[in-house]
Regions:
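Function-determining sites in protein domains
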Residues: 20-133
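Sec-dependent N-terminal signal peptides
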Residues: 4-13
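C-terminal motif of bacterial Sec signal peptides marking the signal peptidase cleavage site
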Residues: 15-18
């Protein structure tokens, strides 16, 4: 009888843990900050991600701290299509995604492609529109 009650308690507790609602990936994001220059600005050469701040130190800045704003940006970033290998962005902006554990991800944004988590994606036009708003 004692073994049955222990097994029943283990079964019930494992059921509670299995039914616990999963947190959304956007729940661990504290803020998002855009730093950008004019998207149509032409230069004689491609601006690399690590050189963006030195070429455009006075860029415009937008901050998103409200959950609705953070969710809308993250939805755009999670539904992106991969770009062809070898494409690198001509960087016109950066997105800094700060997580609740103070780790910051950087997205390097070009008009055609962007670099996020060591992968190159096609830049969503909705993201460009959001940046320019």
């Amino acid at each position: 009888m004692k073994k049955i009650s222990i097994a029943l308690i283990l079964l019930i507790s494992s059921t509670f843990f299995a039914c616990k609602p999963k947190s959304k990936p956007t729940d661990d994001i504290k803020s998002i900050r855009f730093k950008f220059t004019e998207l149509g600005r032409e230069t004689q050469f491609r601006i690399a991600c690590d050189k963006f701040d030195s070429y455009f130190p006075e860029g415009r800045v937008k901050n998103f701290t409200q959950k609705a704003g953070v969710d809308s940006v993250m939805q755009l970033l999670t539904n992106m299509q991969r770009a062809e290998e070898g494409n690198l962005p001509d960087v016109r902006g950066k997105i800094y995604i700060t997580h609740t554990n103070s780790i910051t991800d950087t997205v390097c944004v070009g008009v055609k492609v962007l670099n996020y988590k060591d992968a190159v994606y096609q830049t969503p036009q909705e993201l460009l529109a959001l940046i320019q708003k």
